[in-house]
Amino acid sequence: HVVRSLAGHLARTFPASTRALLLYPQGLDAACAFWACVCAGLVPVPAPAPDPIRLKYGLPRLRSIIEDAHVSLTLTTSRIAALSSELSLANETGPITWVATDQPYDSIDSIEWPQPQGNALAYLQYTSGSTATPRGVMISQRNVLAHCKALSLAGGVSDSSRSLCWLPYFHDYGL
């Protein structure tokens, strides 16, 4: 229900293929925002939430990702969105719209959901930037399905299987 209502809000408010930076603490909010973007036809760009203690390191990395990915939207929590003016994140085309996703959105029943195409961009994954500027990798819908199939075959996954991942959502294996 959370993913569907947020996806409906995003689909009504932003054009398809909008690049959406995801800035969340580790948890379900990040997963819901990621899948809401996918369902709405937006392109999620997962990144670590800024750590107030390490802003000197984190902000240049975030700014690099925003510029490279042409981000125009940030999805996050109300707590992090309240810091938006302090973070001064923008891109070359202007300010970034901030949306706090931890508030309820109306359920959407009559929306035409986009149908993903195999070569369409599913999401942008960025390297950590620990040794250089973060570099983005374009992950297609086909890449996601092939990866899921490979993991299913290697892990003996069935319809009744459940999994748990402790990696951060912005890590390539965290998704």
Task: Report the location of each language-model feature.
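Conserved AMP-binding loop of ANL adenylate-forming enzymes
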Residues: 22, 154-175
